[in-house]
């Protein structure tokens, strides 16, 4: 795996796995268990990528795969699983320089992916599913997120973003 970068932990149906991205594509690693003492590795995509996450945007019971491509690239891609393979379902129409931050989870009861980029407009964006299609919402601009993480506390949702390009750690609150 050359130029590997992205790591995203996934827990589904009690099974832990990890998404790892590199020039050679997007891979899913399953660690050894008592039932299977060997590592299992799936090649999900051959598309060069720096980061990816799995989330069920549309509530159909199958995770979509959101990918930042290529390495620290400018393209947000969303793949849908069909017949055991991931096929491109959506490409964000704008090019986004130096994609870097990624987090997936729930905000306001909806599955979302937060994306940040460190050049150009340096935005923090929220991707979700609305009215039968993918939707991107600008959360903050000119901030240059390097990492993002969401959590729920006292009935509210929050996202923490390390806005490296402006020397800031920001907290965004969603009611």
Per-segment meaning from a language model:
Residues 1-175:
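Beta-propeller-forming repeat regions
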